[in-house]
Swiss-Prot record:
<dbReference type="Pfam" id="PF02130">
    <property type="entry name" value="YbeY"/>
</dbReference>
<dbReference type="GO" id="GO:0006364">
    <property type="term" value="P:rRNA processing"/>
</dbReference>
<comment type="function">
    <text>Single strand-specific metallo-endoribonuclease involved in late-stage 70S ribosome quality control and in maturation of the 3' terminus of the 16S rRNA.</text>
</comment>
<feature type="binding site">
    <location>
        <position position="114"/>
    </location>
    <ligand>
        <name>Zn(2+)</name>
    </ligand>
</feature>
<keyword id="KW-0690">Ribosome biogenesis</keyword>
<keyword id="KW-0963">Cytoplasm</keyword>
<keyword id="KW-0698">rRNA processing</keyword>
<keyword id="KW-0540">Nuclease</keyword>
<comment type="similarity">
    <text>Belongs to the endoribonuclease YbeY family.</text>
</comment>
<keyword id="KW-0378">Hydrolase</keyword>
<dbReference type="GO" id="GO:0008270">
    <property type="term" value="F:zinc ion binding"/>
</dbReference>
<keyword id="KW-0479">Metal-binding</keyword>
<dbReference type="GO" id="GO:0005737">
    <property type="term" value="C:cytoplasm"/>
</dbReference>
<dbReference type="GO" id="GO:0004222">
    <property type="term" value="F:metalloendopeptidase activity"/>
</dbReference>
<feature type="binding site">
    <location>
        <position position="124"/>
    </location>
    <ligand>
        <name>Zn(2+)</name>
    </ligand>
</feature>
<keyword id="KW-0862">Zinc</keyword>
<feature type="binding site">
    <location>
        <position position="118"/>
    </location>
    <ligand>
        <name>Zn(2+)</name>
    </ligand>
</feature>
Length: 153
């Protein structure tokens, strides 16, 4: 079974390097895997101002962040393939990649996989949940040809 993904990519900022639409689709499809037959996903690339505003509004943290996940929750009697939205701050991803000595491509892939797993219900608040999520992220990222995103550089 393969995933039928409808992907909407919104560019609300500019930056030095962005993944291609094909890369975004590959990373999202890999993360979603066989969880759904079809899915609709929006990835919005934003600046630090928009990221900070959303992070403050929805998480109470007054600073920009790398990725925010907004899952779509339909009423129980309605079945829709809407997975949700990812909001990724390009400047934060670039800074983190540089600080963590990762390639931009590898860190963008990690942010898309990480965000998609949140949309699927994974979380990292509790230690046990964090271990499960990080293990799955590592498996998916390594399957894409990148190194373990949690391994110390």
């Amino acid at each position: 079974m393969s995933l039928d993904l409808a992907l909407d990519i919104q560019h609300a900022t500019t930056c030095d390097w962005l993944p291609t639409d094909e890369q975004f689709a590959l990373w999202a499809t890999t993360a979603i895997g066989n969880s759904m037959d079809e899915a609709e996903l929006t990835i919005r690339i934003v600046d630090t101002r928009e990221s900070q505003m959303l992070n403050s509004t929805y998480r109470g943290k007054d600073k920009p962040t790398n990725v925010l996940s907004f899952p779509f929750e339909a009423p129980p009697e309605i079945e829709l393939p809407l997975l949700g939205d990812l909001v990724i701050c390009a400047a934060v991803v670039e800074n983190e990649a540089r600080e963590q000595q990762k390639t931009l491509e590898a860190h963008w892939a990690h942010m898309v996989v990480h965000g998609c797993l949140h949309l699927l219900g994974y979380d990292h608040i509790e230690d046990e949940e964090a271990e499960e999520m990080e293990s799955l992220e590592t498996q998916l990222i390594e399957g894409l040809g990148f190194t373990d995103p949690y391994k110390e550089q």
